[in-house]
Amino acid sequence: MEFSKKTRELSIKKMQERTLDLLIIGGGITGAGVALQAAASGLETGLIEMQDFAEGTSSRSTKLVHGGLRYLKQFDVEVVSDTVSERAVVQQIAPHIPKSDPMLLPVYDEDGATFSLFRLKVAMDLYDLLAGVSNTPAANKVLSKDQVLERQPNLKKEGLVGGGVYLDFRNNDARLVIENIKRANQDGALIANHVKAEGFLFDESGKITGVVARDLLTDQVFEIKARLVINTTGPWSDKVRNLSNKGTQFSQMRPTKGVHLVVDSSKIKVSQPVYFDTGLGDGRMVFVLPRENKTYFGTTDTDYTGDLEHPKVTQEDVDYLLGIVNNRFPESNITIDDIESSWAGLRPLIAGNSASDYNGGNNGTISDESFDNLIATVESYLSKEKTREDVESAVSKLESSTSEKHLDPSAVSRGSSLDRDDNGLLTLAGGKITDYRKMAEGAMERVVDILKAEFDRSFKLINSKTYPVSGGELNPANVDSEIEAFAQLGVSRGLDSKEAHYLANLYGSNAPKVFALAHSLEQAPGLSLADTLSLHYAMRNELTLSPVDFLLRRTNHMLFMRDSLDSIVEPILDEMGRFYDWTEEEKATYRADVEAALANNDLAELKN
């Protein structure tokens, strides 16, 4: 379905003419999830995003649908249970996006180690029980030191005592956002990026009835009326709540910055994702992950009070990560000059909430009695003297300072909150990308209750656990063969096998629409056929307005294909210029945007 600059203009026009049931401010993963469920449930839905979709936090994650094994150090079972359950749901509704990728976790005998081999085994067995993969080929394995080094011979040998392998999944975070957005558009939502909420509309009683918005492309200011407005702006949540300039000024959010660095795979060759302690005794862990022909690693976790739109990688961030990675991979000797790309993102943590990210933070402790009982039960389970039900009973009796009962009752998912201010504004904040659907579901339950009670508007919510995103109309049990069939269709349209498979995996059930463009398009000068098709599909069906949108978020060219990027920037500018009829001045502006984004990702300031 068309989702383009033209439909954007039409959506802005319609938003001015109607009273919406729900207006969503924020087009990251949280807002995208709410938009999909609202539109599919029949609500008159609008969404505005001041940047591009996923430009903030939601395209700057570690790019995993991570199960949170680390939380089991404190046997924080609720968060892991929720996370692996939601991960399974994402596999159902977006089966072309998460890809299984077993994680290697080496264990070192050192101060501050997260796991001993025994604790790791207990944690992995619990993890498998929660994920439902016990006694399957995906079940965990405990490895000896030699077995770890056989898998990853370039790891540091000193202090290594063994390790484990457990099931995890890689993710394309920005694609997950756009596929939710596209499905909402398909179901009738009115959606526009580069539109900023600058204030609220109020009735005589002080209740919010809409927003004053600015189209950042035309500078047009207009009003959008809505029965309910929900704020899903992540790190910007406080700023949006404070737009009313009435009463309390909110300071709920405590953003932290996470940095990832990308190098060529020749600098660190990893055959699978690796997850290990920093070795600094700071209680944190770091990922090293293969992607395309690159290796990336992260993340940092530092409090952040700077520019929310443009968080930057600092020398301190680089030194921290390079020190850790060079220690664990002593033959790598990576320097800042080896870094090909990078990104810095902000986690929308809620101040005072016990849930940090899955790489760090103190998630509390459990009592010695609870721990000893659990260990004894798990040992008996492993020797077949106890049942899974016995383990689950022991888990349920854990006395944890981070138990769900200690969370704010407004939480709709671990680490998230749903609040309604006196003026009627709803704010859905916090959480993790894996939990986005559950967060949206909790918010939508509240939304339909309010619409019924206060506006006599009745809606029946969809079952969002089975409702596919755009591109997700695949049989989850047969994804590989369906993707293969799409790839062969691409080959029949003139693509080589590698390109066809790349696009089939990227677009899922939308791949035939991408390949069909080959009938009407000529290959753009300087671009491959695959890039030509992908670019035109992005402009026509993914509301892609700039080269940076395409290179950084609709695809991963800017992050993981740095070698070939310089050669396609000008051809992309030319092709987008032809499509959008840009003037030379407009093209120069977009060229400058690309150069600025590349300089930022390449760490040009730090290297000079």
Curated annotation (Swiss-Prot):
Q: Which GO terms describe its biological process?
A: glycerol metabolic process; glycerol-3-phosphate catabolic process; glycerophospholipid metabolic process
Q: Name one Pfam family in it.
A: DAO_C
Which cofactors must be present for this protein to function? FAD
Query: Its annotated pathway?
Result: Membrane lipid metabolism; glycerophospholipid metabolism
EC annotation? Answer: 1.1.3.21
InterPro entries on file: DAO_C (IPR031656), DAO_C_sf (IPR038299), FAD-dep_OxRdtase (IPR006076), FAD/NAD-bd_sf (IPR036188), G3P_DH_FAD-dep (IPR000447)
Which PROSITE patterns does the record associate with it?
Answer: FAD_G3PDH_1
Question: Would you identify the family this protein belongs to, as annotated?
Answer: Belongs to the FAD-dependent glycerol-3-phosphate dehydrogenase family.
PANTHER family for the chain: ANAEROBIC GLYCEROL-3-PHOSPHATE DEHYDROGENASE SUBUNIT A, GLYCEROL-3-PHOSPHATE DEHYDROGENASE
Q: What is this protein called?
A: Alpha-glycerophosphate oxidase
